[in-house]
Amino acid sequence: MVLKAVCVLRGAGETTGTVYFEQEGNANAVGKGIILKGLTPGEHGFHVHGFGDNTNGCISAGPHFNPASKKHAGPKDEDRHVGDLGNVTADANGVAKIDITDKISLTGPYSIIGRTMVIHEKADDLGRGGNEESLKTGNAGSRLACGVIGTE
């Protein structure tokens, strides 16, 4: 059985996006056809945050989804937040188009359903910034756009 989810990201500014997820059986979830627009060219941190709450804008989403109480790191690191998806890269027109496969899940205790995806202002330093904030947020800056992940 293939599970599907979708997230529509919006913010106070021009940044918008759509992420479609699929997961077959117990395999890792796949983000397909991710399109983010209205970004400055370059890298931007991309994370799943813990709460599905956007009542006060993206800040209500809380910290990165981290059910195992790990430190912030990059998507290729074994020891990291579940929500650490690394960076997306926007082209000269401010558009990022990517597909990702990650250790995230659409079922079980580490499910991302009902949580919030956030695109950040700056690049994520993947926990290698040499300060305490790097180990929490990757120094990725303000939250440009966000949306709650729901079943499709």
Swiss-Prot record:
It is an enzyme of class 1 (oxidoreductase). One of its GO terms (molecular function) is copper ion binding. One of its GO terms (cellular component) is nucleus. Its main location: cytoplasm. It is found in: Cytoplasm; Nucleus. It catalyses: 2 superoxide + 2 H(+) = H2O2 + O2. Zn(2+) binds at residues 64, 72, 81, 84. Pfam families: Sod_Cu. Keywords: Antioxidant, Copper, Cytoplasm, Disulfide bond, Lipoprotein, Metal-binding, Nucleus, Oxidoreductase, Palmitate, Zinc. Binds 1 copper ion per subunit. Binds 1 zinc ion per subunit. PROSITE patterns: SOD_CU_ZN_1, SOD_CU_ZN_2. Cu cation binds at residues 47, 49, 64, 120. A lipid is attached at residue 7 (S-palmitoyl cysteine). The keyword Cell wall biogenesis/degradation does not apply. Disulfide bonds join 58-146. Its cofactor is Cu cation; Zn(2+). Its EC number is 1.15.1.1. Destroys radicals which are normally produced within the cells and which are toxic to biological systems. Belongs to the Cu-Zn superoxide dismutase family. Homodimer. This is Superoxide dismutase [Cu-Zn]. The lineage of its organism: Eukaryota, Metazoa, Chordata, Craniata, Vertebrata.
